[in-house]
């Protein structure tokens, strides 16, 4: 179990948990680990960017100081989306990238996430190596001086390359679709107008004026209420919401209904399959994807491979087996023909492309997708990882699954961050599904409760 790194880098309340001192150490130790084996022996180059949080510049300066102290050349991108940084690391042939962002988390939090030269998140082994250096009592890393120190180069115009990359994935303009776009007052805010105007989109924006404090504040992919209202009010055909670092996209249909990552993947995947472009006729998702998603895919002859929770695991499965589409219910969608990580703006563009190519509304494109009612209860327990050792809990799950008779599913898993056991079920009706969950929760509470 890693001490500092979670499922998406190092995160915590800025200046309290994630301090400038920690950012310096992460820059110094992380930079060393990622560039120590540079084959040509030249100076290593690392791209650094951030989202729009007020704490971003504080952490950025500390992080960059750490990188410079081990002789790394830093290309400073300023405000950039996480997928944008991932793309630029590869496009520039850099040795690594570091994004300062806490994604969809509130403004109090921030995070530091490393990418390798391939634009992908680090392996657990690399993160463990960085942690070991951070916790070493005496810092024995190199301390170059004079010409051996790193330098900083302004690379804010890298955003132009990223916007051009996104535009090049779309073969035609996207005129004829009216869309409302929510930038979450985050990293995408500065790029939305330029990108969508270049593609002749009829669009309006909300939450695209970051002030350092309003990122994800009742806006963006995790708070779509205002976007839903605006889509209906403006008579738009579509709404798109990104999160703070724009690695996820949630949509809204013409009636104001939220459309999550499962539904977005169904629309894009169905279109790709119809045109022979969905590799191995398979979509990769996590275990959290709705059973209705799998059933809808089956009716179209598309397979669904599932991984544990986390877009990293979806990405690994896709690369290992050559799949072209995958993602999470939360809106992380990976279209690997274009990018190897979840990209909210890329996803939104390709959802619009399907709507234009088919001439259908989002409601029409989703007509065959019938979502199963889902109930999720978080149960406080003494030891979240021991549930399989409690026979009464296992028996309760088996009993519910037997009663479901294939028309539903149960998923029990420990929380990744808290001492909770998550009990989730999907079934034919909300009432029946609630009853299934209640039966399991009762036994879990009795056997494992605090």
Swiss-Prot record:
GO terms for cellular component: cytosol. Keywords: Isomerase, Magnesium, Metal-binding, Phosphoprotein. This is Phosphoglucosamine mutase. It holds the Pfam family PGM_PMM_II. InterPro entries: A-D-PHexomutase_a/b/a-I, A-D-PHexomutase_a/b/a-I/II/III, A-D-PHexomutase_a/b/a-II, A-D-PHexomutase_a/b/a-III, A-D-PHexomutase_C, A-D-PHexomutase_C_sf, A-D-PHexomutase_CS, Alpha-D-phosphohexomutase_SF. Belongs to the phosphohexose mutase family. The lineage of its organism: Bacteria, Bacillati, Bacillota, Bacilli, Lactobacillales. Its EC number is 5.4.2.10. CDD domains: GlmM. Catalyzes the conversion of glucosamine-6-phosphate to glucosamine-1-phosphate. It catalyses: alpha-D-glucosamine 1-phosphate = D-glucosamine 6-phosphate. Activated by phosphorylation.
